[in-house]
Amino acid sequence: SYILLALPLLLGSCEAYLDVNPKSEVTDKELFSTAEGCEDAIYGIYTEMGTNKNLFAYALTFAYPELMTGNFTISQSDNLAYVVQRLWEHENAITVAENLWINGYKAIGYVNKALMHVLPKSDDEFRHIRLYKGELLALRAYLHFEMARIFAVPFASGDAAAKAKAIPYVTTYGIEVTPYSSLDKVFELIVADLTEAEKYLAADEELVTATRDNASDGFT
């Protein structure tokens, strides 16, 4: 009986403990409770994409694509050298692929986490909420396009089995494992995200004051 009486107290203590956050940390609920927080989250995703060498700071910009086309050579001490030589089973080539895969889907996870908080919000809550939604959906489509570009076979491939199992197209944030989609389905989902993003981003002209005519003047 003493145990039963004490149980609610213990459970209450656990809930109180789980609700306590270090002063230096900001919870997701707090972060996405303001427009500035939403923007910080989006900036954070761009920062991760732009500074991570396993993404656009190196691997996905000039390194992996250019080396695969044979435009440049690379030191044998770099793991990418094994990719260039098509030594796919070598542990160094596997490391390159794993890093690309893990960091690419980690970035997609950040996007989905932000969308989880942003999509339910109405226009009345934040002035630019439609732009946040559109930008995040476009980012999700773009990141999946990059993953398909690197890891999936091309449309022209005759390998039906490989095309049937291209990459996972992840649209939720959580511990659930997303199954692989076919190449056709991946691009169907990319187009769907971009179409939805375009609808939201159409609010740009209404919400953002800017000179839009002759934007290319001065460029050759």
PLM feature segments, named:
Residues 142-173:
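Extended ligand-binding groove/face enriched in aromatic
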Residues 201, 212-220:
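Aromatic- and glycine-enriched pocket-lining scaffold segments that form the walls
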Residues 79-151, 176-184, 198-202:
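Conserved, well-structured interaction surfaces
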Residues 50-55, 70-74, 143-154:
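Secretory-pathway/luminal and periplasmic proteins that interact with or process carbohydrate-rich
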Residues 14-63:
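Membrane-proximal, proline-rich intrinsically disordered regions
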Residues 42, 108-111, 187, 194:
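Inward-facing hydrophobic residues that define packing positions of alpha-helical scaffold repeats
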Residues 2-11:
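Bacterial N-terminal signal peptides
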